[in-house]
Each structure stands twice: as structure tokens, then as C-alpha cells.
């Protein structure tokens, strides 16, 4: 297709005039996923999915492969950038009522689950101490499922403990899932353009729209330039900022790290898991911390779509954002008072947001009537 025709297609795509920078994170996520697939391919070429050689193959990539250190750091830090963008993208959807486009929201939540699974499998691949123990702790949660738990865990591990078959299948899953993510992302974008993007006011945009190109393309390019600058600065100057010191040691099943914790982007879910002193209860809470997003489109009761003109709801939303950060912070601390109490209070507040959101909507409707 000639260059002008592609631009014409973008030019014919109508977009609301007043969409803010928060709407740029979708295109940034697309850029992140492209980066992850490309760097991931070059890493997979040199990686060896064997428990005796995996750790050494990572060292080989960073030391001996030309620009291997760059590929490895771009892939690891790119994952963090991906999660920063996706959490902002979800927060924007919650704040401005984008979830009322139900199909788009449900496909997006499925994408989040797939992304979290992919990131978890990827974290296991270097076969460092924290990789091994994080895999042990999380896969062990399957044993909490009544009747089927033990069988499912053995099936997932490929044996009676985490071993070579586990690493091989995790590598296979880590390689194949991104293609599922790309397919579902295409569906997500397709469903979005059935109705079109919402806007900060939460009103119908049909009366005031502009062409996507050149206005939004340049806006997207500016944000992409900022994201790329931030990514390259971290890769160049602080490459180990998101890494756990324990993961620089090879996996040893006989030595348990003092404090097992996942990557920062899973800390909120891990904090919710840890706040319940019961295996099955914790596993259910962990699952619900993500699955509860699926309920949001069906529990919207307010007559207003966006939170822009709902001060009480804004207060609740920013309390929820602070709660998310508090859970993440408390998860990095040892399992002892006061951190356990903080985790439990924050986990309760996390779920209370989703429970009180429809009630707040009904209350606001009553206030508007009077």
C-alpha cells in the first residue's frame, strides 16, 4: 500500500479533539510489545533452556554476544516499562469510564492476565535464586485447589519438583504467549474502533472530531520519544535498578532466600496473597485482585461516565492509587508487624474500592436529583 494511502487511512480515523496525554499509552504499549518481541527473539537465539546451562547462557549473552548486554537490559527493563504503561492505561480507563466500552475492556483485562503470565514465565528463565524460589512459591499455590491441586502442580512441573522439564515448558510458554498477546491486541484495537475512543468529559465526541493524522500521530511520537529516552537512560546508567540481588546467584534448591519476592510489577498481587494467613484464601484473593477488573463495566451506576465531575469518586480513586502503592511497598518488607497489618489494611481497601464504587454512583445520582 503506498505511503499516502496509509496516511489517508489514519487521516480518515476521527478522534475527539480533547483527548489528553493519558490516551497515548495505548500506542506506547504497542511500541513496548514490538520491542519485547524483537529483543526476545535475539535472546532466545542464544538462550539454553536447561537448568545446568540457563544461568551460564545469560552470562554468555551479556559478556560474549555482540550487543547482548543491550538486548538483555532492553528486554528486562522494557518489561518494567510495559507494566508502567499498562497500569497507567488501566487507571485512565477506570478514571474516565472507558470500561463502559465492555468488549474492549474485557479483551484488555484478558490481555493483562496473559501479560502477567508471560512476565512470570520470563522471570523464571535466568534460573537465578529469586527466579527459582518465585516459581516454587507461585506454582505451589495450585496445590490449594481441592482434589485437583496436587495433580495439576505435578503436571505443570513435569515431575515432583521444579526441575529441567519445568524450565523447558516455561521457556516454550514464554515464547508462544506473546503471539497470543499480539493477536488479542489486534482484536482489542478492532473492538475499540467499533465505537471509538471516549474523552475526558465522558460525552459523545461525534460533534467535535479531528483526523488522527497529523494531530494524534505527532502527539504519539512525542510520547514515544519520551519513553525511549527514559528506557535508554535506565539501560545505560541504572541497568540493575529493577533487579533483585539474589538473582545474580545461580538457583540453589538447598538455600532459601531470606525474603522471597517477585518483580515490582507483581508486588501488589503478592501483597494481597501474603496478607491472608491461609493458602486457599490467599490464592483466591490473588486471583480476585486481577479478576475483579472484569466486574467494573457491570457495576457502573453513575449517570456520569467520567470521574472528572465527581469529586467524591475522585477522592476514592486517588485513595485506591495510594493503596496500590502501599501494598507494593509493604510486600518488599519482611512478614512481621507492622508490615503484615499494613498489608492487610491496604488489601481490604483495595477490594473496598470496587465494592463501594457502585454505591458511590447511586449516592451521587441521589445528590444530583435533589
From Swiss-Prot:
Cofactor note: Binds 2 heme b groups non-covalently.
Listed InterPro entries: Cyt_b/b6_C, Cyt_b/b6_C_sf, Cyt_b/b6_N, Cytb/b6-like_sf, Cytochrome_b, Cytochrome_b_C_euk/bac, Cytochrome_b_N_euk/bac, Di-haem_cyt_TM
Positions annotated to bind a ubiquinone: 193
Binding positions (heme b b566): 89, 188
Membrane-related topology note: Multi-pass membrane protein
Residues that, per the record, bind heme b b562: 75, 174
Localization, UniProt: Mitochondrion inner membrane
A GO MF label: ubiquinol-cytochrome-c reductase activity
Cofactor(s) required, per the database record: heme b
GO CC annotation: mitochondrial inner membrane; respiratory chain complex III
One of the GO biological process terms: mitochondrial electron transport, ubiquinol to cytochrome c
Parts of the chain that traverse the membrane: 25-45, 69-90, 105-125, 170-190, 218-238, 280-300, 312-332, 339-358
Keyword field contains Mitochondrion: yes
Alphabetical keyword list: Electron transport, Heme, Iron, Membrane, Metal-binding, Mitochondrion, Mitochondrion inner membrane, Respiratory chain, Transmembrane, Transmembrane helix, Transport, Ubiquinone
Pfam assignment, any one: Cytochrome_B
Subunit comment: The cytochrome bc1 complex contains 3 respiratory subunits (MT-CYB, CYC1 and UQCRFS1), 2 core proteins (UQCRC1 and UQCRC2) and probably 6 low-molecular weight proteins.
Protein family (similarity comment): Belongs to the cytochrome b family.
UniProt xrefs under PANTHER family: CYTOCHROME B
Function: Component of the ubiquinol-cytochrome c reductase complex (complex III or cytochrome b-c1 complex) that is part of the mitochondrial respiratory chain. The b-c1 complex mediates electron transfer from ubiquinol to cytochrome c. Contributes to the generation of a proton gradient across the mitochondrial membrane that is then used for ATP synthesis.
General remark: Heme 1 (or BL or b562) is low-potential and absorbs at about 562 nm, and heme 2 (or BH or b566) is high-potential and absorbs at about 566 nm.
Name the record gives this protein: Cytochrome b
Species assigned in the record: Chilabothrus subflavus (Jamaican yellow boa)
